[in-house]
Amino acid sequence: MTTRDDSDPATGDGSAPPHRVHPPRRRVVGRIIGVAALVAFIVAAPAVARLLDFGVRVGEGAAVESSVEGFYGSATPTPASTAAPPGTIVRSEPVVGAPDGAAALRVVYHSTDVDGADILVSGLIVAPGEQVAAGTRTVVSWAHPTTGIAPHCAPSSGIAPFALIEGLTDLLADGNVVVATDYAGMGVPGPASFLIGATEAANVLDIARAAQHVEGIGASDRVVLWGHSQGGHAALFAAQRAATYAPELDVRGVAVAAPASDLAALLQDDIRDVSGVTIGAYAFNAYAEAYADRLPTDPLSTILSPAGVVAVPQMAKLCLLGQNKRLHDIADPMIGSFLSADPATAPVWSELLQENTPTERITVPLFVAQGSKDTLIRPTVTAAYVAAQEQAGATVTSHVYPEADHATVALTALADLRAWMRTVG
């Protein structure tokens, strides 16, 4: 595959990148995150977290480690690129380490935030190595579980980026293009989007659009959404909003593993341990910034203890991978004393949690996987979501895996997921 720098000021110095990114087709587009799959696992296993905290593996033709941070730039589009529609790629570079025979790009692309404003977001595009005609391959848009909310927590920036795309090797072997957004605020600096459904949805859908601008990989408008935990939340919102936000995409189905489908229940179930304090800190920090015009002045003080108010911005700077001990040091003393009020009943906060809970009927085939041993996303919560979708008339394929927990459910479900994808994609 080849790329071209079309002399866009945002793409760099004019040298030829390794894949050809072609100009976008103009679209009429309506303006319109969850929970860590790794939280429970990493909180219990800081040594493993340290082992996984490596930088990008570099090779000839790839950006060296020291250049990765500079790749992401600013979340605010440059004047030369502000008119570009969602999905337009403004920067790209190759990433080594993809499964054998595959090629990967790190990209920065246009998307939108909760207010419909134009922003830049980063992510990965991975494709089988064989070049094929345009429109040949289904695009699987992967929504990752929680890794943090700070820019340096982005999966594409080097926190084992391919290892965190669950099922990547098999999805590529099945002939799919796989894309993986970082979500707004990660990679490219900007406001966090953790568990903000509209922003997550746009980011997940727009990177599927972006794949169509990479020549030679055969990305079609057929899209399957796939997410785990926080990523399940993102994928469900993407499915809810696809018809209006990205009507040109042919979304064939949405698959989720242990999705964050009920935010109020999530906080009530988990706030009494380190995982819950961490999830709460990420969410409350993101909401306080994204919804500043709706929340009272000093919004964190309306639901958090004084110690919690101090801790949230500190925790927001830390990633689950590699900074786990520091998260523990901050969160442990606050277990049982983090909240001063219940966000599920507090004015405005309760409305925001409800708005960002995916309750609409899913109109495309829905695959749901849940582990019986999951203590982060409770099986009863997922069962209630499945029942509500079935009652609303959704087409649901549901699997409960007796031995799976939160960290293992996505990979446990992979064989069933691939079989289901063959029926929809």
Where are these regions (language model features)?
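C-terminal catalytic histidine-bearing segment of alpha/beta-hydrolase fold enzymes
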Residues: A341, T345-E351, N356, F367, ...
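Alpha/beta-hydrolase active-site loop
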Residues: F194-E215
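Catalytic-loop region of hydrolases
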Residues: R27-L38, A45-V132
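Short, surface-exposed "cap/lid" segments of acyl-processing enzymes
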Residues: D113-D174, G187
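Short beta-strand/loop motif that positions the catalytic acidic residue
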Residues: I362, F367-D374
